[in-house]
């Protein structure tokens, strides 16, 4: 295999969830003989069970294939798989930075989705050659002409000569590979310059330590050299380099333009942050632009149902953290739920995936509190605090202002659902910035508070648009607003895990709706349970869970009324005593009640 740069093609695939990206990748591997028929597990690249089950790609993967083109030359194709979901957009931008081109795979029956548009713009901004591919053209609902027009109007790239393919039946796969060889430029790089390599992804292997997927920009990386990670300034000796075919295949070295893996005995994933630059120790080059540490945006408390699982939960989070630099966690204790962890996530999908993996892979039973976002709190003394837990908000008398994170959302929705979607955005305190009609789709830009989005916005967006609307968002700024802490008291005891930060205008309405919900969820006791909603010291709503009544007079038939009175009096005193010392167990549903904010529930 000649290692000249002109015979290398680095590309990734941009596609919405379920538009057939992983299937196309499998076809490429099959066609280029990367695996035997027996080894072809459906969706080779989605190696996590959860990835296959949800049909999404979470971590970036890569494959190096040798392809014999129609022009008689053999090309080395490096395919870097990217995650498609909005929570993982930083991982996408790093995967794209390692490529010279991208395939834009669009489902011919469904058309363009907001997520695809966002990733496609990232690719175009980074100067990649984008090749459109219409997949699933054999479906009865496929409408290639409409989709071609959508691609040209919404994304603005020429799509009339797009390859028509069906990954399932293998149609158009060879043509797609020919397009890659013909249209995607070869990588530029200097084989003799000092080493410069981009870390596309890192994951932890129990035997090897951290394995990093890298794209070599200049120079070459080989075994036994001493490499340096730019952001941490740490140095390591390289133990092994190689490529994935998709099996791990060691090589002597990787040169400029190539994509492969590096193992250097790094013990934890923070040692090789995604997007960082690797150079040779003592002969450093300037770091590559665009690296930024990952910031969690959504926070939630995870508590084990039985307190003896606390250490197991810590261990499980530590193991997940090895593979997921975006996951943050620190111990937290709650009066209502005992000991647990405050965890930070990239977004809601990320949170669900972590929670599901903890329960599935580590057999833990967990209670999750309502997710919140980070707020900036300016105190009267002029200190600026970052608060990710409503229960740690300072006393209202000490607060000058509370600032909430504002996001810029881009929503793509078919014409007929625009009204419903705009109504939903208004309800979520969104401010419309821009609106464009494109064919039969509308692209709407809104600025809205992130805390309104993390609760149930995605679910409601899907239900108001019958599943057709899609959205992507990015963080804009912190902005001061009139926010208050809404607390809930059960039996006059505040339950810290139920506290939420809400806008003052909707606080009373939210408080009343939630105590009604709690009333239905909290099981009846032998005594009345009072549920109250409060802002500071002011109670804004109250309801009761009625006591169960035990018929103590059932054993008296006929006879003296004073006997019955005595028994009822005794029961009354017992209930009074019980009420003063009785505690109320809150079921998991009570903590989830805070999540859904819509009135119709």
UniProtKB/Swiss-Prot annotation:
Organism: Hydrogenovibrio crunogenus (strain DSM 25203 / XCL-2)
PANTHER family associated with the record: TRANSLATION FACTOR GUF1 HOMOLOG, CHLOROPLASTIC (PTHR43512:SF4), TRANSLATION FACTOR GUF1-RELATED (PTHR43512)
Protein localization: Cell inner membrane
Protein EC: 3.6.5.n1
Residues that coordinate or bind GTP: 18-23, 135-138
Keywords associated with the record: Cell inner membrane, Cell membrane, GTP-binding, Hydrolase, Membrane, Nucleotide-binding, Protein biosynthesis
Domain tr-type G stretches: 6-188
GO CC field: plasma membrane
GO molecular function: GTP binding; GTPase activity; guanosine tetraphosphate binding; ribosome binding; translation elongation factor activity
GO biological process: positive regulation of translation
Family: Belongs to the TRAFAC class translation factor GTPase superfamily. Classic translation factor GTPase family. LepA subfamily.
Annotated function: Required for accurate and efficient protein synthesis under certain stress conditions. May act as a fidelity factor of the translation reaction, by catalyzing a one-codon backward translocation of tRNAs on improperly translocated ribosomes. Back-translocation proceeds from a post-translocation (POST) complex to a pre-translocation (PRE) complex, thus giving elongation factor G a second chance to translocate the tRNAs correctly. Binds to ribosomes in a GTP-dependent manner.
Tree of life domain: Bacteria
Predominant place of localization: membrane
Pfam families, per database record: EFG_C (PF00679), GTP_EFTU (PF00009), GTP_EFTU_D2 (PF03144), LepA_C (PF06421)
Protein name stated in the entry: Elongation factor 4
């Amino acid at each position: 295999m000649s290692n000249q740069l002109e015979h290398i093609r680095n590309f990734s695939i941009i596609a919405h969830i379920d538009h057939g990206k992983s299937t196309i990748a499998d076809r490429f591997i099959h066609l280029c003989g990367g695996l035997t028929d027996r080894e072809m597990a459906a969706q080779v690249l989605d190696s996590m069970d959860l990835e296959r089950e949800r049909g999404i790609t979470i971590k970036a993967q890569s494959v190096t294939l040798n392809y014999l083109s129609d022009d008689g030359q053999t090309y080395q194709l490096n395919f870097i798989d990217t995650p498609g979901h909005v929570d993982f957009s930083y991982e996408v931008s790093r995967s794209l930075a390692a490529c010279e081109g991208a395939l834009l795979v669009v489902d011919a029956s469904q058309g363009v989705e907001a997520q695809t548009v966002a990733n496609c713009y990232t690719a175009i901004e980074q100067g990649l050659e984008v090749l459109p591919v219409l997949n699933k053209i054999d479906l009865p609902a496929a409408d290639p002409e409409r989709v071609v027009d959508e691609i040209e109007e919404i994304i603005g790239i020429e799509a009339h000569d797009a390859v028509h393919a069906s990954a399932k039946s293998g149609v158009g796969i060879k043509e797609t590979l020919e397009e890659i060889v013909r249209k995607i430029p070869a990588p530029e790089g200097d084989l003799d310059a000092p080493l410069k390599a981009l870390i596309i992804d890192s994951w932890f292997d129990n035997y090897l330590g951290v394995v990093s997927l890298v794209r070599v920009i200049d120079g070459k990386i080989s075994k036994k050299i001493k490499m340096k990670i730019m952001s941490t300034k740490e140095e390591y000796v390289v133990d092994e380099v190689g490529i994935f075919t998709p099996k791990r295949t060691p090589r002597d070295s990787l040169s400029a333009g190539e994509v492969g893996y590096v193992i250097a005995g790094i013990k934890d994933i923070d040692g090789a942050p995604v997007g960082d630059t690797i150079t040779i120790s003592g002969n450093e080059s300037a770091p590559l632009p665009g690296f930024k540490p990952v910031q969690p945006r959504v926070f939630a408390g995870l508590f084990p149902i039985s307190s003896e699982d606390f250490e197991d939960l810590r261990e499980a989070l530590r193991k997940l953290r090895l593979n997921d630099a975006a996951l943050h966690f620190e111990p937290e204790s709650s009066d209502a739920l005992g000991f647990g962890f405050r965890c930070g996530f990239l977004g809601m999908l990320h949170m669900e995936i972590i929670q599901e993996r903890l329960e599935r892979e580590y057999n833990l039973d967990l209670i999750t509190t309502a997710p919140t976002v980070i707020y900036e709190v300016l105190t009267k003394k002029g200190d600026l605090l970052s608060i990710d837990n409503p229960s740690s908000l300072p006393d209202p008398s000490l607060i000058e202002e509370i600032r909430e994170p504002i996001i810029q959302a881009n929503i793509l929705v078919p014409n007929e659902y625009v009204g419903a979607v705009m109504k939903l955005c208004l309800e979520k305190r969104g401010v419309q910035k821009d609106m464009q009609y494109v064919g039969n789709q509308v692209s709407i830009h809104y600025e809205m508070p992130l805390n309104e989005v993390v609760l149930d916005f995605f679910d409601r967006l899907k239900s108001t648009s019958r599943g057709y609307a899609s959205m992507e968002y990015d963080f804009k700024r912190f902005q001061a607003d009139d926010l208050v802490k809404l607390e809930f008291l059960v039996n006059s005891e505040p339950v810290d895990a139920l506290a939420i930060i809400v806008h003052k205008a909707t606080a009373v309405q939210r408080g009343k709706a939630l105590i009604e919900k709690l009333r239905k969820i909290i099981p009846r006791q032998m005594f009345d349970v009072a549920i109250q909603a409060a802002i500071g010291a002011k109670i804004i709503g109250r309801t009761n869970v009625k006591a169960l009544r035990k018929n103590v007079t059932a054993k008296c038939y006929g006879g003296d009324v004073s006997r019955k009175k005595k028994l009822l009096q005794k029961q009354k005193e017992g209930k009074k005593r019980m009420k003063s010392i009785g505690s109320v167990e809150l079921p998991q549903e009570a903590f989830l009640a805070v999540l859904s904010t819509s009135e119709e529930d």
